Amino acid sequence: MALEEIFPFIYGVRILYVNAFLLAEDEAITLVDSGLANREGTFLRALSEIKHSPGELKHIVLTHHHTDHAGNLAALVEASGADVWAHPLEAPIVRGTVPLPRSNPKSIMLKMLWPLVGRLSIYGRLAPAPVDHEVADGEELPIGGGLKVVHTPGHTSGHIAVLMPRHGGVLFVGDAATNILGLRPPLGMSTLDMAQAKDSIRKLGELEFETACFGHGGVLKGKANAAFRRFVEKLAR
């Protein structure tokens, strides 16, 4: 585990190749995404490192249902009693009332690699968990300093990013884009609709934020929205 302080009381928690984020500025702590399965102890240790107990984790915001982002959800809810917030298109999948959707890789290479994707826990088994609050595009949540929901479909149908208004705007991107060797679209083999995903990146480029935090890749701190706008221009070429 790597614990990174992004701003005072805002932390990134990296487990292998995926990031989640603890927002501890308010009395009720909020977690954005829950990371890879069977790693709930990692988050409990992270809470301990920042001098908090599991019971102080009150809210978990889920950007989407993939198990590298939702894998610890059920275990963390059991450990903390936290409420879960997710988009209505993700909620039935998280609850386990509908099956996990499958991507449709187009190229021969992706079709050959597809069985490996499940083994990497992108589409592996997801333990059912409650979703207490279904959120809508543009909704301002009464948690995490007033997080604003941005529906960013493409990677999954109900994928969301969330924007914190503090610190000049902090955008929690989820997998709407990645920041590995520069800004990039989400991974093609695990994205339901890449054209829609690129439209969502354009939507994010219209927002005002200074910092961007990604599910995969490093934090962009300082004029992150300008970097997104340059990325949007690159996608349009």
List PLM regions with ranges.
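Metallo-beta-lactamase
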Residues: 37-38, 123-132, 140-226
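Residue-level marker for buried hydrophobic side chains located in beta-strands
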Residues: 30-32, 61, 84, 170-172, ...
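Short, electropositive alpha-helical surface patch
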Residues: 223-237
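Short, hinge-like loop/turn segments at secondary-structure boundaries
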Residues: 100-106, 191, 230-232
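Conserved beta-strand hairpin/beta-sheet module of binuclear metal-dependent hydrolase folds
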Residues: 1-50, 161-174
